[in-house]
């Protein structure tokens, strides 16, 4: 049994990863700033209130976990909206992960993926919606910070397909494809994956590690 601590375990991706992990018999510590009224009750599931920017909390959770999962929205931060950049939380996360020999898995975004070999990034294309550039840029910034990490933490960053989110939950198929830094599309040009199949790929990486200190992407 693996102990998995999920920051953002009540969100769209985090809850899917939580449920997949619990279904495999793992212990899950779900860290959230506010416990939802409909929080599930399950064997092996524990909720803790807290924030990923609390370095002391990160340290205590890392001491118990085999894997730390960061599944929190990449708010732009620094814009007066009261939200901090997730990149600012990464130093304490990587340090704690390295200290306690825990893996660090990050739910990333698709916008930092290249649209084809040689670029550009999806984020940098003219068609990319302006209203999402702040969040997408924050996710890309976090990936850059991980790539520059010097703690030696064993991290992995999983970029989903372009059409991934609660607006497009899809249906579980039990299948997915893995790529590297280039956006994956199907034969009709669509880039999609359901929440359940993204979680399947994420927990497969936890159970059978194949990616170390790198980003990979999953899609149909």
Regions found by a protein language model. Give the residues of each.
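N-terminal Rossmann NAD(P)H-binding glycine-rich loop of SDR-like oxidoreductase domains
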Residues: 4-24
């Amino acid at each position: 049994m693996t102990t998995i601590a999920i920051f953002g375990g009540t969100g769209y991706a985090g809850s899917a990863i939580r449920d997949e992990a619990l279904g495999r018999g793992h212990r899950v510590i779900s860290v959230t700033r506010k416990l939802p009224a409909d929080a599930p009750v399950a064997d092996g599931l524990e909720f803790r209130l807290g924030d990923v920017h609390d370095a002391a909390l990160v340290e205590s959770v890392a001491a118990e976990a085999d894997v730390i999962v960061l599944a929190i929205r990449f708010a732009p931060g620094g814009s007066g909206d009261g939200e901090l950049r997730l990149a600012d939380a990464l130093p304490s996360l990587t340090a704690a992960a390295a200290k306690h020999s825990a893996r660090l898995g990050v739910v990333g975004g698709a916008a930092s993926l290249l649209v084809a070999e040689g670029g550009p990034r999806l984020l940098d294309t003219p068609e990319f919606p302006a209203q999402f550039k702040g969040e997408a840029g924050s996710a890309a910034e976090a990936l850059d910070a991980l790539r520059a990490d010097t703690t030696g933490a064993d991290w992995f960053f999983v970029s989903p397909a372009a059409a991934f989110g609660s607006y497009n939950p899809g249906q579980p198929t039990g299948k997915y494809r893995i790529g590297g830094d280039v956006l994956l599309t199907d034969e009709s040009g669509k880039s999609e994956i359901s929440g359940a199949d993204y979680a399947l790929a994420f927990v497969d990486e936890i159970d059978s590690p194949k990616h170390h200190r790198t980003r990979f992407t999953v899609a149909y």
